[in-house]
């Protein structure tokens, strides 16, 4: 399974297994990418990207951050972005993986005077399972994760549908996607809840409940040559009222963007048509 790197900085816009922003995979089909090298060969790429991350907390501006972009595949193991995984099943039509990754989330009261008196919420690590169904150029991906450090004691799950268009014999491609993200009441309450101790004038107590967020995105790539690739991703998400009604949240919609360049090391796949 070949994924573009994912990177998100807020759990409210994080794609489970995303993470963030996990770009659609390169699908098989009439304009399919060239065959991958044998699975026993190490395949990896490294690059640099820039992300623009919406931060919905009151008084906190969007953040633009440079990030390293890493992909590594060896046999059934892989690392991409902020996640690592193992393929239990990996066929042309189905994949079933165990996956672990960082949750780049959290609240820092120093980020805004309007958050004064809030207790810091920490990033965490999540683990879970991902099932992908890949009929032709389409992909239906379902994932479920739990916070294994117990910071939020919460879970999140997602279902995404995407379609890949490949052009000019794999020179460039586009993939739109739509999806939904469910987050448990514990997770929502941890990141946007307000405890009685955090109440201030204009900031009443708030207890978060489970939320269902909607998102849509567009991923694209352009291969400069067999080793250098440009990638881009833009994703919009609408937050559930269970999140946007929190007194420490002032945005119900957000946009995430990523642009980057990567260099592929090691063995190369055969050129298309060779």
Residue ranges with predicted function:
Residues 67-71, 161, 252-274:
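Outer-membrane beta-barrel "beta-signal"
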Residues 44, 76-79, 94, 137-140, ...:
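Repeated loop/turn-to-beta-strand initiation elements of outer-membrane beta-barrel proteins
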Residues 46-52, 83, 98-102, 129, ...:
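Transmembrane beta-barrel strands of outer-membrane/channel proteins
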Residues 22-78, 266:
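Short glycine/proline- and aromatic-enriched beta-strand/turn motifs that initiate or cap beta-hairpins
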Residues 87-88, 148-251, 265-267:
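Outer-membrane beta-barrel transmembrane domain signature
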Residues 46, 68, 129, 159-161, ...:
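Membrane-embedded beta-strands of outer-membrane beta-barrel proteins
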Residues 42, 62-68, 92-94, 121-127, ...:
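Residues that define the transmembrane beta-barrel architecture of outer-membrane proteins
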């Amino acid at each position: 399974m070949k994924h573009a790197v994912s990177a998100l900085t807020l759990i409210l816009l994080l794609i489970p297994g995303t993470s963030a922003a996990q770009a659609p995979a390169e699908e098989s089909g009439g304009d399919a990418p060239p065959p991958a090298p044998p699975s026993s060969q190490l395949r990896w790429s490294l690059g640099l990207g820039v992300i623009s991350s919406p931060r919905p907390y009151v008084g906190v501006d969007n953040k633009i951050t440079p990030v390293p972009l890493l992909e590594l595949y060896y046999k059934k193991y892989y690392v991409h972005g902020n996640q690592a995984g193992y393929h239990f099943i990996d066929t042309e039509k189905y994949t079933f993986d165990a996956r672990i990754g960082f949750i780049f989330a959290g609240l820092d009261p120093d980020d805004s005077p309007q958050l004064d008196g809030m207790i810091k919420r920490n990033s965490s690590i999540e683990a879970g399972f991902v099932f992908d169904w890949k009929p032709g150029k389409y992909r239906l991906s379902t994932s479920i994760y739990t916070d294994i450090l117990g910071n939020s004691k919460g879970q999140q799950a997602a279902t995404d549908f995407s379609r890949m268009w490949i052009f000019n014999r794999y020179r460039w491609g586009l993939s739109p996607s739509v999806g939904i993200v469910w987050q448990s009441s514990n997770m929502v309450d941890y990141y946007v809840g307000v405890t009685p101790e955090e109440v201030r004038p204009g900031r009443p107590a708030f207890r978060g409940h489970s939320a269902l967020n909607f998102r849509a995105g567009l991923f694209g790539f352009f291969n400069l040559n067999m080793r250098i690739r440009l990638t881009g991703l833009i994703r919009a998400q609408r937050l559930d009222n269970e999140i946007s009604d929190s007194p420490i949240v002032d945005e119900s919609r957000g946009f995430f963007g990523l642009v980057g360049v990567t260099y592929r090391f090691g063995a190369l796949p055969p050129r298309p048509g060779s």
